[in-house]
Amino acid sequence: DQEYLLLHSCPPHFYTGKTLTKEAVWDFSLWTRVEPDDVMPDGRIFIFGHTPTECYQDKLPLSIYYGNGKIGIDCGSGNRHEVCRLACLRLEDMKEFYSN
């Protein structure tokens, strides 16, 4: 079975800062954006938000991003724009759902 890691933003084990405090790692994990070439080292698929999918692909309206062991699900629902919407991904069959 496939394993997933669901986080708001960047996985804490991507942290490479010199200050290894709980607060520093927390701040990193909360605010750092995932890069297109970031890969989970343990084979899990990393599902994340925080960064709208338009930063990774040119699809309108915004849609779920798949790439390099990552799935981006932030389709900009917090923004009031016609191309932004809420996304949901059912992991059992990878079926996508979107708000109108």
Residue ranges, per PLM feature:
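Acidic, His/Gly-enriched loop-helix segments that form or flank divalent-metal centers
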Residues: 1-72, 76-82, 98
